[in-house]
Amino acid sequence: MERISALGLDIGKKRIGVAGCDGTGLIATGLTTIERTSFQSDVEQLHQWVKEREAQILVVGLPYSMDGSLGFQAKQVQKFTRRISHVLQLPVEYVDERLTSVEAEAQLKSQKRFSTWDKGAIDRQAATIILQQWLDSRR
């Protein structure tokens, strides 16, 4: 079986949720939430996860508008992603992330792990959903 090493990213203005997968590519797991301070800091933290997980690809949630168009936030995500892809020298695949934060919050509530204070948990869970969708689409 081919080994898969991908990082799933939920990129927001304030935070980046990060998820990874097991080598079989079956299960995505939330890893961390990066508090965004500067591009350089974002890259350094992502680079550490890329090295640690031996990531071969970045799977990024793209926040399409409900009508399917690319709005302002989606274009910002693409711009940031192009930059990190270039610096980290990794390919990128996008996943439609509409409503993943809503789904993430619902999952955390059902698991009794939801806190209005921990926005990072939602971002991390959203990254997990994004990566899991991508993994499932490859089967």
Curated annotation (Swiss-Prot):
Which PANTHER family did the record assign?
POLYNUCLEOTIDYL TRANSFERASE, RIBONUCLEASE H-LIKE SUPERFAMILY PROTEIN
**Any one Gene Ontology cellular component term annotated for this protein:** cytosol
Question: According to the entry, what is the taxonomic lineage of the organism?
Answer: Bacteria, Bacillati, Cyanobacteriota, Cyanophyceae, Oscillatoriophycideae
Name of this protein: Putative pre-16S rRNA nuclease
Query: What organism is listed for this UniProt entry?
Result: Rippkaea orientalis (strain PCC 8801 / RF-1)
Q: Which GO terms describe its molecular function?
A: nuclease activity
Q: Per its database record, what is this protein's job?
A: Could be a nuclease involved in processing of the 5'-end of pre-16S rRNA.
Q: Where in the cell is it found?
A: Cytoplasm
Which pairs of Cys residues are joined through disulfide bonds in the record? none
